[in-house]
Amino acid sequence: MRRALPWFGLLLLTISFVRLVRLPGPIHPTPVPVVRGERPLVVVLDPGHGGADSGAMCGTIMEKDLTLDVALRAELLLRLKGYTTVLTRDNDRYVSLAERTAMGNHADDSLFVSIHFNDGQRAAASGVETYYAGQSAGPAGFFSWLSSWQRSASTPLAAKSESLARFIQAALVERTRALNRGIKSEQFYVIANVRHPAALVEGGFITNKSDVTKLTTTEYRQQIAMAISDGVHRHWEARRDEPTLTLAAARPE
């Protein structure tokens, strides 16, 4: 038996070697280029008003409560899509405009969506609209204190903000079937002072009987939240698919 063991061991070694040779070699997958900004690091949701600042009111219905409810719903939906989210407030407390924009500027690559509901001078005013901060038209505008380089650099940002507003507005109309009041350019503080694509949503008129009746239902507020989530996602998909161009600096001859 002792003389047979070396031969038996040699046989096992041979079989193992043959089996090893038949196995496929290590797989080296083709490197896939990482798309910059595959997902925004942060989607900042800004429920308007809060604390002593109730916003628009209709009886006991307060804008600050509606904005927080919609923001919490939108946050969950965005997280389910794989986005990281931040809320400028997650309870009934006052947050200054400066604090809100600071949170919006914290991440290097993010989106900012401020959520509001309208207060119309006419009871007949109704519908949904979305704002973005376009480039100031003249030297007396909001950005007049910026250098010329900074003003020119704000143009791509304004275009991205307009895209975000457009996608959110389209989703709002699609989801709620509300009157489409379109997208508009305004230098509202919270969106004009964020260094990333930003939009401000007006999800209906608290001063309109039809609008406020719908806003008191969880189903309708869920539709608004879904529209915000849809709009953010569609904007990001469109932005992700855009070709990235590398511009070479001109060399003096």
List the model feature ranges, each with a label:
Residues M1-E253:
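Catalytic-site microenvironment of enzymes
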